[in-house]
Amino acid sequence: NNDGTCIAIKRINLEHISPQLLKEEPLLQLNYHSATYIGYGPFALIPKTLVIDENYTTFLPLENNLRQRAKTIVNPLTNDILIAAYSNQWTIPNIKCRKYHEVELLATMALNSHTTNTMWAEITPQRINIIVIHDHKLQLANSYHISCDNDAAYYILACYQQLNLPQEEVELNIIGDLLTINPVPFLTDYIRHINTPQPQNWNAELPNQYAPLFTLQTKL
């Protein structure tokens, strides 16, 4: 609603928005003050020193139609470039949406956390997106295919090891679909500080287990 409180949740698993869904889904028939589309797709973190010209999309092995969808996010602290492209851009005829890439939002949230060193992980049923902040700067942005709790835990711990992050000190913030894949119980034996940040203005009347699904959306 107008104060940002979540008043309705509906989860629909699909590969594309069909004409039938557009006609039959009640939530898509309403008028909204604002709407947000969060997409996914290939992305890369590019050190500024490697960039010769402004054609950042050449760093992504994409077809031309996907390159045209690419969005560039420049880290204001280092001028390093995070470039992301949408795999698809669904449109809903009667709803005008602001479009964001999920990694863009995750990186922005991590950089705005005001924590010197931290890791952020977003879980989906098919992948885990990992952002690492070191000295308030974006050190890592990567995505890995996962299918179970152990996969997610493996990639998180591998990032700690490869980047020499002290597991007793560097906190892990984990959000996303923890109902489907949840490595937190396993990771508590290895990482001292694990947080599951809650969405802003979360409605106490809604089931709390759904909250991590919407942390990114409510940080916009």
Describe the residue ranges of each PLM region.
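Hydrophobic/aromatic-enriched cytosolic interaction surfaces used to assemble or bind macromolecules
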Residues: 1-220
